[in-house]
Amino acid sequence: FNLKYTDSGRMTANLISPKMLDFSNREFNFIEFPEGAHLDIYDEENKKSTVVANYAIVYNKTGIIDMQGNVVLNTAEQDTLFAEQLFYDQEKEWLFTNKPVTFKTKQDLINGKGFDSNSKFTNAEVLEIDGSFTLDE
């Protein structure tokens, strides 16, 4: 299954999964991907970041994608985030979680509880940090 998301004709996200369950007949409708999902996120410059997870659910009314289980996010800059759960707000193009994460950059390995970032990762922030990281003086 292949689900594309666009904004003003520009593709912002593409969700691919082997199986989709459509619950659009519910009052709070959603689409479930019980066999895992692969999500490509494109920023305004068409740079691609990728998220894979064991399970995903898309809440149609809110535009939130909830990815769970062995979530791995690879940014266009080759940074990697490991988490058990990660949310993507399609409207705000925002990624976030309040679960434990490990964020690996070219020079640092940062552990924390929570993560916030725009889809460009220009303001990626690991919350409640624990681990080694480099400080600019």
What are these regions (language model features)?
Residues 1-137:
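Mature-chain termini and adjacent capping regions
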